[in-house]
Amino acid sequence: MAHAPEPDPAACDLGDERPKWDNKAQYLLSCTGFAVGLGNIWRFPYLCQTYGGGAFLIPYVIALVFEGIPIFHVELAIGQRLRKGSVGVWTAISPYLSGVGLGCVTLSFLISLYYNTIVAWVLWYLLNSFQHPLPWSSCPPDLNRTGFVEECQGSSAVSYFWYRQTLNITADINDSGSIQWWLLICLAASWAVVYMCVIRGIETTGKVIYFTALFPYLVLTIFLIRGLTLPGATKGLIYLFTPNMHILQNPRVWLDAATQIFFSLSLAFGGHIAFASYNSPRNDCQKDAVVIALVNRMTSLYASIAVFSVLGFKATNDYEHCLDRNILSLINDFDFPEQSISRDDYPAVLMHLNATWPKRVAQLPLKACLLEDFLDKSASGPGLAFVVFTETDLHMPGAPVWAMLFFGMLFTLGLSTMFGTVEAVITPLLDVGVLPRWVPKEALTGLVCLVCFLSATCFTLQSGNYWLEIFDNFAASPNLLMLAFLEVVGVVYVYGMKRFCDDIAWMTGRRPSPYWRLTWRVVSPLLLTIFVAYIILLFWKPLRYKAWNPKYELFPSRQEKLYPGWARAACVLLSLLPVLWVPVAALAQLLTRRRRTWRDRDARPDTDMRPDTDTRPDTDMRPDTDMR
């Protein structure tokens, strides 16, 4: 086996200057906590349920094996070898690729704005869980105290608390509304907690991560044990994992599987590059990539089982309530004795009455009661946490305790992800020396958190939820795929496969297998090209959003509306802003080198008019010894 050349001693000595993790456990927990986030709890179970249950695992595993793990390995390897943040890493590989690092920093900044807003929402619900009864358990009375608020009666108590008492949402994105002070306070508190945890980088996050990364697994286990003992839990699990293979013909399934991999592993954020830069240069990054990716996958499955065992109970409970209301209508209209119709007898009785009294039965307010319909009502994203799961808690004994556990788990999950997201912004800024050396890191961290907080106040407006959906749909998904594509291409085709494999051999003691080389060189770039092309095609369709409008004729269903022109422009800008750094930085580098070449040419004697041909960037993947 060929061995990579030994690096300069000065490069190795850099490890004494750069901060290091106290132990391997801190690093693995930080990477796992950064990767395992809110999406593992509410997006992955929803995708499994939407796309054919167990059938969704097929594209998910394929995307994980041929796209997720290889790119994850690339990020850990370049961060560990160069011992810099994303900007420093890509500048070292090629100055023309410095825009990739700037794009990662910009993307992490944008994601941190709306992600910590969700953490603020979670904090608001967590604080409201310390009361009995829970504030979303019943509708508030109207002004006359003669009934309940009409909007709440037309929807549900949990929906009213979410859309009106929490978000106080407007009916249209054009109506910005005012800042909601309770959300602003929770947002400030969330950023204050993040600042205190990342104030000194890995020195402080390495201590907090023991709790924030492990506590969610404890709560998931508690919910799983409790959920499996509830009636209807097995129905939820059967519905979740029953495969529908025909759904694999839908290209959207494969796109969602690919994007879920990027969200669940937090790829292309730059956070893993930053975390890996604090490792020992001889750390086995290949093993870390595989272990963390598999832990992340098992966490998603584990969370799906826990979530849908509880949602199966809710669906069964709603289904039985629907049957009971229909049975009561039949008993009252046909003067049957009380309890004369059981739930098991209801279908036969209804069929008999339809045959003998069809007109009379047609006039009754009977609803179609199908268990599958209630299982289909599970929601994705914040709706799962703030509407579906809060309603489920109400049916469980000791509802406030379960609410506190659930939102406490979400809060710690969100914090763990925020640690990596903020570190992806701060580490490159420290590496490039944005502030003078005498300015402490605590000041830069505080400045970044303050700017993020002020920028995120737009999400505390009454229209803030619409803006959050725009950021989530257009700032995150397309840029993650495009930046990941540039990462793979930059390492394999700009830096060079052989040189990269030599570096990995020096770090891990073994050269990458054909699996790694094939995925890096062909499979991952090809898959990413297809996914990016498909996303571009989706952008040609009219852009729509769903509004909460109590005056909508189909209320409580959300009204689908077209984005206004200015909002569409914002969508396009957000989808291009991070990746625009790539051509801009490359052009700036080209102009800088051209000016330098012209200046050198003017300074030479007239007899030597030959330009300097050695203008290639120094892409030796050795750390810069002139670093803090």
UniProtKB/Swiss-Prot annotation:
The keyword Endoplasmic reticulum appears for this protein: no
Coiled coil spans: none
SUPFAM superfamilies (alphabetical): SNF-like
Side of membrane Extracellular, spans: 48-51, 112-178, 231-253, 312-399, 466-474, 541-568
Cytoplasmic side: 1-26, 75-88, 202-207, 277-288, 423-442, 498-517, 592-628
InterPro entries: B0AT3_SLC6sbd, Na/ntran_symport, Neutral_aa_SLC6, SNS_sf
Membrane topology of this protein: Multi-pass membrane protein
Keywords linked to the UniProt accession: Amino-acid transport, Glycoprotein, Membrane, Neurotransmitter transport, Symport, Transmembrane, Transmembrane helix, Transport
TM region(s), chain numbering: 27-47, 52-74, 89-111, 179-201, 208-230, 254-276, 289-311, 400-422, 443-465, 475-497, 518-540, 569-591
Annotated glycosylation sites: N144, N168, N174, N354
Keyword Flavoprotein: no
Region feature Disordered, mapped onto this chain: 602-628
Record-level Gene Ontology MF annotations: amino acid transmembrane transporter activity; neutral L-amino acid:sodium:chloride symporter activity
Localization: Membrane
BP terms from Gene Ontology: amino acid transport; neurotransmitter transport; neutral amino acid transport; renal amino acid absorption; sodium ion transmembrane transport
Tissue: Abundantly expressed in kidney, but not in intestine.
Example of a GO cellular component annotation carried by this entry: apical plasma membrane
A UniProt-annotated Pfam family: SNF
Protein purpose: Does not show neutral amino acid transporter activity.
Pathological association: Genetic variations in SLC6A18 might contribute to the disease phentotype in some individuals with iminoglycinuria or hyperglycinuria, that carry variants in SLC36A2, SLC6A19 or SLC6A20.
Homology family: Belongs to the sodium:neurotransmitter symporter (SNF) (TC 2.A.22) family. SLC6A18 subfamily.
Name of the protein in its database record: Inactive sodium-dependent neutral amino acid transporter B(0)AT3
